[in-house]
Amino acid sequence: MRYLPLTPEDRVEMLGAIGVKSIDDLFVDVPVSARRDAPVDLPHHAGELDVEREMAGLARRNRAAGEGPFFCGAGAYRHHVPATVDHIIQRSEFLTSYTPYQPEIAQGTLQVLFEFQTQVAALTGMEVANASLYDGSTGAAEAVMMAQRVTRRNKAVMSGGVHPHYVGAIETLAHAAGVATQALPAAVDAEDAVIAAIDQDTACVVVQTPNVFGTVTDVSKIAEAAHAAGALLIVVTTEAVSFGLLKSPGEMGADIAVAEGQSIGNGLNFGGPYVGLFACKEKFVRQMPGRLCGETVDADGKRGFVLTLSTREQHIRRDKATSNICTNSGLCALAFSIHMSLLGETGLRQLAAVNHQKALALRDALKAVPGVEILTPRFFNEFAIRVPGKAAEVVEILAAHGVIAGVPFSRLDAKAGLDDVLLVAATETTLDIDIPVFAKALTKVFAQ
């Protein structure tokens, strides 16, 4: 097909067909203050080499995670990704994030998704898992919508330990769906407050373990309280490696388990793309959002894989759809599945143990720093500390000395009144020498 550009006469004819005089008439509902009528002042075009140099200069303004001591977490964790993962996902058969709509030519991709679902169900201790969602936060929001459909109630209670960004995503989607949300105040240990907030109008209770402060909680009591009130329990996990050591959501009575899978097979990716893990009890499968890959038998009796229970709005009436998720980061799900296959159950357990040991060493070192208070009593590979003054200022000072000290809680929730709280994490990538360097740097800052 040839490309035929629009002529001025074509534009006049098209505008007349829709009943307007000019292109500007199409944007009268946009406030004048929000319009940009003047040309954008962009630099002149440049050759490829010059552009590469310019981009490299911009990149040098950032400090890469591996350039020095690095203790950031708060929902995005630096882990080692084996070279095998990148090698396999770059095969031409896999290098696409697109939905495998035609099963007859996508059996390999569909089988990978089926294996991914099996791995996620095993990790979360649930009966069924979908083929991934965009990320952990949107997965949590989808879980709340699912709970509304299952219970026919319109209230979601969110623990004070749920990551503030997840709370924001839930509130955004819930508002449009007519679901009332009750976000409890941020708290290191929020179990009692959550139980007290459950009532007969509650559709679901959203808890996180390890929570945003790193606290590990057995949420079995919360599950009992939620179920007694007829509500569902949604358990969120932002650090998937923790599944190697801790009780699974299913073991603790979760109805829906949501997790961010970035920690396995995926880098920090400057905040995205990530991969959302979503699993639930089988009795709720018809209300589960996203795609589900199933195993079947063809007309010749051969095993095959297909997308099943596709209740997305692209397939059925919008008001009956369980989600509107479209092409998501399927390649990230593949990376997750490959890394999990390389680790195996024993490897994941060993990796999780190393993470916990590194965090214990970090805790012991920081506990000895005058002025530092350890706030998190039980943790996996991340915990919160209280520092003298504002944590954000401490982070900036240490960054100037080459130490990325962690994430100030105020950057996640500026209104929580926790300006002196710093979240620090350690993984298998944390060098033993990095820990005393961090502790000594903190000591010097507080001594000034």
Swiss-Prot record:
Family: Belongs to the GcvP family. N-terminal subunit subfamily.
InterPro entries with a match to the protein in the record: GcvPA, GDC-P_N, PyrdxlP-dep_Trfase, PyrdxlP-dep_Trfase_major, PyrdxlP-dep_Trfase_small
Keyword Oxidoreductase attached: yes
Biological process, per Gene Ontology: glycine decarboxylation via glycine cleavage system; nucleoside metabolic process
Annotated source species: Caulobacter vibrioides (strain NA1000 / CB15N)
Keywords: Oxidoreductase
Keyword Oxidoreductase attributed: yes
Cross-referenced SUPFAM superfamilies: PLP-dependent transferases
Catalytic reactions of this protein: N(6)-[(R)-lipoyl]-L-lysyl-[glycine-cleavage complex H protein] + glycine + H(+) = N(6)-[(R)-S(8)-aminomethyldihydrolipoyl]-L-lysyl-[glycine-cleavage complex H protein] + CO2
Quaternary data: The glycine cleavage system is composed of four proteins: P, T, L and H. In this organism, the P 'protein' is a heterodimer of two subunits.
Role this protein plays: The glycine cleavage system catalyzes the degradation of glycine. The P protein binds the alpha-amino group of glycine through its pyridoxal phosphate cofactor; CO(2) is released and the remaining methylamine moiety is then transferred to the lipoamide cofactor of the H protein.
Name this protein carries in UniProt: Probable glycine dehydrogenase (decarboxylating) subunit 1
HAMAP family: GcvPA
EC number(s) recorded for this UniProt protein: 1.4.4.2
One term of GO molecular function: glycine dehydrogenase (decarboxylating) activity
